[in-house]
A protein has these predicted regions:
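Cyclic-nucleotide recognition modules
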Residues: 59-98
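Short phosphate-coordinating micro-motif centered on Lys-Gly-acidic
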Residues: 26-31
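Cyclic nucleotide-binding regulatory module and flanking cytosolic helices
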Residues: 1-25, 61, 66-67, 71-72
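Glycine- and acidic-residue-biased ligand/ion/polar-headgroup-sensing regions
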Residues: 34-47, 63-65
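Short loop/turn microsegments at loop-to-beta-strand junctions
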Residues: 15, 33-34
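A short beta-strand-loop-beta hairpin characteristic of the jelly-roll/cupin
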Residues: 44-57
Length: 98
């Protein structure tokens, strides 16, 4: 999901900026989901790892895109893994901060 400028500014005020290098894992599937993420710079890959270790690509996200929507559900766990394609800067917002 891509967000408008007003929501983008709100995210910047409420969240925490984090930096990741190429190939860093931002989060793994089955991690507890308690925050939304917004891409500020760079690109991230969203994918699922099957039981036999195969990776199924779901999406590539860039600036202005939100991911981690599974955190909107109480006691949710991440259904996907997200990793940095290149150097990435994101904002993370815990649900209670939104």
């Amino acid at each position: 999901m891509k967000i408008n400028d007003e929501l983008f500014d709100y995210f910047k005020q409420a969240g925490t900026i984090k930096h990741y290098q190429k190939n860093d894992i931002i989060y793994m599937q089955d991690d507890h989901a308690d925050e939304l993420c917004l891409v500020l710079k760079g690109r991230v890959r969203v994918y699922h790892i099957t039981k036999n270790g195969d990776e199924i690509n779901y999406d590539v996200l860039d600036k202005g895109r939100i991911f981690g929507e599974s955190s909107l559900y109480e006691n949710a766990y991440r259904p996907t893994t997200v990793s940095a394609i290149n150097d990435v800067e994101i904002i993370t917002c815990h649900l209670e901060d939104l």
